[in-house]
Amino acid sequence: MRILITGAASFLGRHLVEYFLSKEEEVLALVRENARGRDELLKYEANNKFKLIVLDMKDIERLDIDFDVCIHLAWGGIGKEGRMDENIQRENIDAAIRLMRVCKERGAKRFLFAGSQAEYGQTLSDIESKYGNDFDINTIPKQSEDFPTKPKSEYGKAKLELKSKLKNLGDSLGIEYVHMRIFSVFGSGDHETSLISTCIKNFKENKDVHIGECIQSWNYIYINDLCEAVYLLSKKDLQGEFVFNVAGENNRILMDYVKDIKRLLDSSGDIVVEKKEAASEGLPFLNPNIEHLKRIGFVESYGFEKGIKDCI
């Protein structure tokens, strides 16, 4: 099987390239000219199953090699300002639609798109207004794939809009569409300012970690587990389903993850809680249900603690 991975120089992309190559699949890694992380893909050039393609998404019609499956990760405007920029997100929508048409020309049969938990739009304030400040996450309905979607950001709105647009286009072109609602992924190579990266760095050095209250429900999936989930979604009979939450098996209060990292590193650094300004889209409240993913054979092999041990 030959796989095209767009956004291959990203954190998720680099790990997926490595994972699919480990499964003896052919990988076409598509990156833009100045992509951060591009150089980290050069180590695979000696592998005859790997091909690096330098091409901007705006020129995607120039892609001239056939493939079987597309995993579309490339996306502009993922930072704080970009997530709320409607024009940037419109460009992403247009690029994804054009890419699917190219997939038809190049013989692809399945198209996996990196959707997001941001499509749900559920926030801590939503939960507190409905259940009060002393909520119990075990009594709050989980976010299954048919859970109401009320995205707060232009980023989330764009990802959600593509769910129906790409599904309909895929049906008309004879391409099976898979919409992956990816939750919070961690692992080596993640952004150095992420909560996990910050906690590991500071606790390793026995330094304090300054964070917000972290009282919302959260879900982490380790990058190796995510790669396995995406691999299954690229290969398995999906039994008519096309929307899948891609997340870990456990939903927990965010602060509990922070405490686990401190414990695993046996750190003398303290957890310092500070009042932090929430993003304009609010504090996400993540409590996904992954039964759809489990039905196609997904088992979380690593989980949070083993994943953290791998990182440290």
Regions found by a protein language model. Name each.
Residues 54-91:
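NAD(P)H-binding glycine-rich loop region in Rossmannoid oxidoreductase-like domains
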Residues 89, 141, 147, 151-160, ...:
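Short-chain dehydrogenase/reductase
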Residues 203, 207-312:
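C-terminal substrate-binding subdomain of Rossmann-fold SDR/epimerase-dehydratase oxidoreductases
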Residues 3-23:
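N-terminal Rossmann NAD(P)H-binding glycine-rich loop of SDR-like oxidoreductase domains
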Residues 93-99, 156-166:
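Conserved catalytic Lys-bearing alpha helix of Rossmann-like short-chain dehydrogenase/reductases
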Residues 72, 97-154:
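Conserved Rossmann-fold NAD(P)-dependent oxidoreductase catalytic core, especially the SDR/UDP-sugar
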